[in-house]
Amino acid sequence: MILGFVEVSHESLALAEAEAVCGAEALGGGGVAAGVPIPGLVAVEVPDRDALTQLAGRLALARRCLVPIPAEGDVVVAAGGEGASGGSASFRRLGRPSGGGADEAVLASGRAFKRAGGSIDLERPDRRFWLARGNEGREYLLEQVAAIDRVAVAQRRMPLLPFQRPVSLPPRLARAAVNLGRVTPKDRVLDPFLGTGALLAEAGLLGGRLYGIDRDPAMVRGALQNLSFLGVAADELLVGDSREVEFGERSVRFSALVTDTPYGRSSSTGGEAVLELISRVLERWSDRLTDNGRVVVVVPSGLSPGALPGTPRFRVPVRVHRSLTREFCLYEKAGLTRSSC
């Protein structure tokens, strides 16, 4: 295992940090409680650098994945040591826009790298180094392993899809929810409130096998349009009541249930209160989860602690749209019981 860092970036840092840790868990690693105390970074443990690159390909609420360079308290000396192997590099301050004025530690690190035999290239460097100041004032030298492709995520925004509804989760938040579910290739993923298919689309892009249910035939047709547009195929999408319908493969078990519960005037619950509907649906499908299965459910904000069944591992309010806040709740199968939250 190696130590890595994720630079998170979202107004809900709690959700961004949880996404990074759960994403690392999906790759055989996890979070590190005693990480380097650098603001804006989450410490994770992954099998190797390739896994850190894979993590960058999974995440949506982050900027980059990095590894620490041993500095023994002097980042300039460490930068010189890296320059001895040649090649080009860039040096910047983490969390500070380029062109923000002179930074002596950054400049000195670049000079040391160059003196040792390397060269400086700010446009297309072979390696990208970042300096970061910890909470205790100590300087750290980090090397970027991979950057998050935020443009690709933005290209999946609702206005760019063929089937559109104003209340659908933005792709960044949908991807974060799927990462909380630790979805990996070939995992079967269920969304019992399919909607526009935003959650299943993100699960499919991570290689998951997709199953969805919605009582509105128009939503199922629209979700199929969106999935096809994004190059994602579903195993089975059903029209009907999530408490009653059954998939063709009756014994199918799911690694993750990930859903955004109905809300807004355009959503249909068949006249049932949303909280009661959620509880009944989770009760119906929880025994179809694999032993280490997870449930990620996005619910109306402001619920009382006992409003949902089970004990969540993680629960945080997140602003989804300008005037709409929802709560992201993560359950392990073992914690999805009738005890109060």
Language-model features, listed with the residues they occupy:
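N-terminal auxiliary segments of SAM/dcSAM-dependent transferases
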Residues: L13, A20, E72-Y140
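Class I S-adenosyl-L-methionine-dependent methyltransferase catalytic core
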Residues: M1-V67, R115, R124-C341
